[in-house]
Amino acid sequence: WDNYPVNDATMKGELHIGPYTGRSAQLAEVSRGLFLNPMNQAEASKIALGAGAAYMNDPKRYDAEDAWTASAAKVVGEASVEALYIFRDACAISPLHPSDPPLLTEIVDSAKHRMDRGALVEAAGILSAHMYKMKASAELLRTNSNKKLIQEIAPWLDEYTQWADIGIDIARAIEAASSYAESLTPSGKTSAFSMRA
């Protein structure tokens, strides 16, 4: 009994649509079978279940990302896989992936690093570019022909879009702060110190 992608009890707010990982290639040698426990969102569960089936079919040659991509394509169609991948990142937290969303964390860290160096416009650009990608991916997914899936994940898509809007507002605030700081410095250069003053 493998408790993935189930999202009951304290996990009700999570959407487990990430890759099926963390299972040994030798598991089949010591087990007669494997039962994956799905979410209440049956259609969304097919993404993880399909990847899990690929693992069980050939554990030794299993590639988690390849299996996820193939399974996702069956659920949303190949044209929407990239959009689902970006959305998947924001929903990454699960028992298999307890860390913060990797792609989103990388984007935020990159923007913060540039802010620390005083490159505020560059930081805002990095942040806003990804936030607009998030919004575009949500819009594309909402038009997907798999209406049952979209109905199931609608609450997460709505929250995802709201966070993207917040990110865009933050990027605009950073740009405004940069313009203000430039107006205060004779050289026209923005410094991290001037932003903290």
Language model features by range: what are they?
Residues 60-197:
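C-terminal functional modules
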Residues 1-65:
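Catalytic-core regions of glycoside hydrolase
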